[in-house]
């Protein structure tokens, strides 16, 4: 699978450069956009993104993991970071999040609340209306931090 191949190539590069690979997202059809999100204990600057992008591009030129043309984007995950795995979810307990499910739960696919806790592969949200809901992480299309600026 393309995403697995990309993680296998990119993870050692980011680690060797001293960064944490936060996640990879592949979007589009035809000409793909490969988004690589990096983090660092001291934050991530534009220069950091350029350094990582240059290294990854050089390896992609040799390994050629993507057939055809693509756009490579390297950035910080930002304040409203996507949560790519259950370990990241565990570290973000207490944060406001937005969840989008793969299939409707009742009649809705979008939920907003506080990431209350993680139990095994389940994330439990305390919704804005005070109700609690649990999702298997694999049933989520997207889970993203949703900063509260009020």
Curated annotation (Swiss-Prot):
Compartment(s): Cytoplasm
GO terms for cellular component: cytosol
UniProt key word Cytoplasm: yes
Keywords noted in UniProt: Cytoplasm, Ribosome biogenesis
GO terms under biological process: ribosomal small subunit assembly; translation
Pfam families the UniProt entry points to: DUF150_C, RimP_N
HAMAP family xrefs: RimP
Record's function text: Required for maturation of 30S ribosomal subunits.
Family recorded in the similarity comment: Belongs to the RimP family.
NCBIfam families noted in UniProt: PRK14633.1
The name this protein goes by in its record: Ribosome maturation factor RimP
Organism, scientific name: Francisella tularensis subsp. holarctica (strain LVS)
Originating gene: rimP
